[in-house]
């Protein structure tokens, strides 16, 4: 199970590739892809299908034995995006000595210093010319070798570096791409890299620079995910937040059988930037799909509203593990430990969807699955983050709980999680769908 997770993390450096890999797994396990621009058609018990939005979010459904109005739906939500750096248009910046760096902007809230002095690569999607101007072609890009690096300033020029130095997002975190060897490469180095990679994987069509219309490209850690520790009990990887929760939900959905209740896996994009996009949790897209299912079953919108009242949502986004070097940052009585099981998250300011009722439901699921669970509340003097649970609940008023596995160094280029916690999470998710 952990080897599958590590392979998924390595193959999913950005949201677009994560969604492709999830879609491929769904197809391989009997789910069919649905085009949301076409009629949904008849919906029967046991039907398995999924839909994507913007190539960066994916929603999978297994229809229950009972109509959605009668049995509701059980939904696991997570997000496919992670903090990183986006490549700007006109990105190449030629400096002295022919060294080329790339102009970037920050996506989300990364711990920027953790991206320094490590091999990085590029991944994302490239938009190329198609037959219809309204329907350009999308190609995914993942350069599977070290390509870039953000280099620190030597300590001899920055004696205060170990005392904490403010970083400029425009100046300090621009990665080195290469060094031009001829004037012909000037201004074309990035495009040449993109074309070389796309053409090496192309099936028949040879692309040239004029075919490239635009791109959504991001930096990614080039070092593979791994386990570490005396007993290999820890996981070290980028994007544990939140791809580990996405993959746990996927594994649970695949492992489950048809039950009375419809099963939903909703993996959104753009949680790290507020979720207010067509592919984010703030979009009505998921509610549209659920309503279409209800209408296909009963031909009445009333069925959708009944289904919502009978539904339960698990919003799965990683939680903060207790850090042995910084115990003062945590609540004195509610600080989850690595390996202690899934974490229920609470917040008096309603940043999380959990309440006493939904927390009791999730704790009961953990007990049935033979899995320990923990509770997290912020230290009252430390502002915490938020997640997608209540954003989704504001448009679909679902009963639900916010939870996640505990990790260290959230939003670092490489985060630390627990092998045992991933196994626990898949177990309780499978129990939920069952």
Where are these regions (language model features)?
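N-terminal hydrophobic/helix-forming segments and targeting peptides
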Residues: 1-434
């Amino acid at each position: 199970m952990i080897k599958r997770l590590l392979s998924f993390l390595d193959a999913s450096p950005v949201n677009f590739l994560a969604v492709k890999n999830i879609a491929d797994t769904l197809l391989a396990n009997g789910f069919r892809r649905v085009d949301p621009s076409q009629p949904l058609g008849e919906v029967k018990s046991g039907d398995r299908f999924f839909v994507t939005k913007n190539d960066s979010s994916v929603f999978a459904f297994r229809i229950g034995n009972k109509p959605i109005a009668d049995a509701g739906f059980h939904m696991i939500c997570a997000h496919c995006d992670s903090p990183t750096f986006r490549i700007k248009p006109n990105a190449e910046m030629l400096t002295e000595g022919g060294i080329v760096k790339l102009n970037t902007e920050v996506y989300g809230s990364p711990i920027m210093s953790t991206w320094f002095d490590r091999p990085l690569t590029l991944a994302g999607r490239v938009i190329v010319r198609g037959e219809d101007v309204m329907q350009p072609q999308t190609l995914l890009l993942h350069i599977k070798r070290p390509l870039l690096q953000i280099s620190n300033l030597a300590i001899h020029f920055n004696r205060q570096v170990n005392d904490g130095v403010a970083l400029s997002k425009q100046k300090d975190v621009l990665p080195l791409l290469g060094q031009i060897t001829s004037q012909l490469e000037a201004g074309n180095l990035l495009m040449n890299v993109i074309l070389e990679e796309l053409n090496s994987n192309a099936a028949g069509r040879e692309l040239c620079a004029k075919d490239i219309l635009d791109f959504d490209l991001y930096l990614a850690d080039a070092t593979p995910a791994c386990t570490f520790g005396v007993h290999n009990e820890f996981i070290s990887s980028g994007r544990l937040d939140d791809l580990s929760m996405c993959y746990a939900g996927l594994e649970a959905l695949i492992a489950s059988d048809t039950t009375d209740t419809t099963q939903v896996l909703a993996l959104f994009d753009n949680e790290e930037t507020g979720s207010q996009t067509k592919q984010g949790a703030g979009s009505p897209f998921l509610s549209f799909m659920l309503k279409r299912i209800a209408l296909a079953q009963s031909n009445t919108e009333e069925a959708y509203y009944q289904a919502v009242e009978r539904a339960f949502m698990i919003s799965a986004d990683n939680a903060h593990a207790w850090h042995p070097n910084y115990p003062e940052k945590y609540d004195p009585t509610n600080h989850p430990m690595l390996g202690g099981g899934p974490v229920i998250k609470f917040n008096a300011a309603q940043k999380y969807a959990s309440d006493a009722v939904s927390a009791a439901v999730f704790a009961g699921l953990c007990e049935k699955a033979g899995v320990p669970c923990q509770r997290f509340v912020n230290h009252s003097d430390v502002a915490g983050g938020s997640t997608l649970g209540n954003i989704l609940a504001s448009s679909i008023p679902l009963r639900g709980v916010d939870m996640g596995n505990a990790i260290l160094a959230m939003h670092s280029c490489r985060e630390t999680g627990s092998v045992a916690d991933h196994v626990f999470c898949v177990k309780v998710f499978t129990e939920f769908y069952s």
